[in-house]
Amino acid sequence: MSRTVNCRKFKQELEGLDFPPMPGAKGQDIFENVSKKAWQEWLSHQTMLINEKHLNMMDLTDRTYLNQQMDKFLSGEEYDQAEGYVAPEK
């Protein structure tokens, strides 16, 4: 049986992550309060932001920006979108 969490983003009980996605208190907070579904959506959005905004993960400013966007995304707040992105038709 998988563990469930009260997801901060979707405001409902959903399947939780199998392990903290990063070390430290922030990783533990995500593990305890963010669902697997929300985390997968964040990873996809993060990839779009890195590619479309040409973020350099070696640059502290870009990493800080991405962390701020992650916090907003996972909290259900308004977050930046990749300019010019058009979702593929299904």
From Swiss-Prot:
GO terms of molecular function: iron ion binding
Keyword Iron: yes
Source organism superkingdom: Bacteria
Disulfide bonds, paired cysteine numbers: none
GO biological process: cellular response to oxidative stress
Record flagged with keyword Iron: yes
Record-level GO cellular component terms: cytosol
Keywords: Iron
Free-text function comment from the UniProt entry: Could be a mediator in iron transactions between iron acquisition and iron-requiring processes, such as synthesis and/or repair of Fe-S clusters in biosynthetic enzymes.
Family classification: Belongs to the Fe(2+)-trafficking protein family.
Name of this protein: Probable Fe(2+)-trafficking protein
